[in-house]
Amino acid sequence: MPQTLHVHSRVKDYDILFTDHVLKTLADCLGERKQRKLLFITDQTVYHLYQTLFEEFAQQYNAFVHVCPPGGQSKSLERVSAIYDQLIAENFSKKDMIITIGGGVVGDLGGFVAATYYRGIPYIQIPTTLLSQVDSSIGGKVGVHFKGLTNMIGSIYPPEAIIISTIFLETLPQREFSCGISEMLKIGFIHDKPLFQQLRDFQKETDKQGLERLIYQSISNKKRIVEQDEFENGLRMSLNFGHTLGHAIESLCHHDFYHHGEAIAIGMVVDAKLAVSKGLLPKEDLDSLLQVFERYQLPTSLERADVSATSLFDVFKTDKKNSEQHIIFILPTETGFTTLAINKDDHQFVEKLDSLL
């Protein structure tokens, strides 16, 4: 497996580096910046699991640490403000750097701070969950939630580099591992059927090298899509399969009941059911999706009686993918994907949605 993937970006090119030696790879990435101030942003879970790693950072660099509570509620303007306070207190300049080390929440949060502090300072991502390694760290999207709405404030701001190490996955709980698989299945279902089939048959306990290949294959797929459509005007929209409903579920559950990959799994099932109902997708493909989700213990239906189709529809109206008058869903097809535009006043769709949940 190649050690590096180079990503072309209209904003700034960057490398994805695969390694078992995080400290050395980070040192190589920093180069002359080793002498600059570095703010490591992480969460309490990662900080306690890898305290010796942070001690190494403190010995080698002019390092500061910001530790967030774990979970989606840290993706907030309040947390951004707290990090700004620390950067200002430590007199960080435009030449200093942020390094995120954690899952998707930490990466999105730290990247947003980097994009906005002094109108942009450099940052490096070290994703520690499967989901962040294969999905959220790739493509430059950064942002935070606002008033409960998912990823309402953000930008596209690529990092200097992304450091991928499967060593971090050795301490990853099964629930988080399955959430990463959810995003890998998403890209496989639409763009790479062999990847989907390999994930369906994968045996985590006995095939570490197989996992590394699947991660590389997933990242390569996303890299290809992002390079063709960085600002999500066409092909990259396909990566929102499951996300219109998934993000609404996360918002209504306050970003703590379902993890991201779980909410997206429910969204993918509903999108696939819509596609089947419109004759766009064979029923056998939906059945295959349901089977593999069940194998990885991912939810396939909404388990919250307090979240109604009506309340979900109201949240859909704030989705960033929408056009002026329409809510946009991404539907899988036999050969790829298509978009479904639902009028924001189409209350009949609420009844349809209720039957699919």
From Swiss-Prot:
Task: Please tell me where NAD(+) binds in this chain.
Answer: 104-108, 128-129, 141, 168-171
Alphabetically list the UniProt keywords.
Amino-acid biosynthesis, Aromatic amino acid biosynthesis, Cobalt, Cytoplasm, Lyase, Metal-binding, NAD, Nucleotide-binding, Zinc
Note on cofactor: Binds 1 divalent metal cation per subunit. Can use either Co(2+) or Zn(2+).
The record's section on CDD domains has:
DHQS
Residues annotated as binding Zn(2+): 183, 243, 260
Q: Which residues form the signal peptide?
A: none
Catalytic EC class: lyase
Q: Which cofactor does it need?
A: NAD(+); Co(2+); Zn(2+)
Q: Taxonomically, which superkingdom? A: Bacteria
Give the principal location in a single coarse category: cytoplasm
Role noted for this protein: Catalyzes the conversion of 3-deoxy-D-arabino-heptulosonate 7-phosphate (DAHP) to dehydroquinate (DHQ).
Q: Which family does it belong to?
A: Belongs to the sugar phosphate cyclases superfamily. Dehydroquinate synthase family.
Q: What is this protein called?
A: 3-dehydroquinate synthase
The encoding gene is aroB
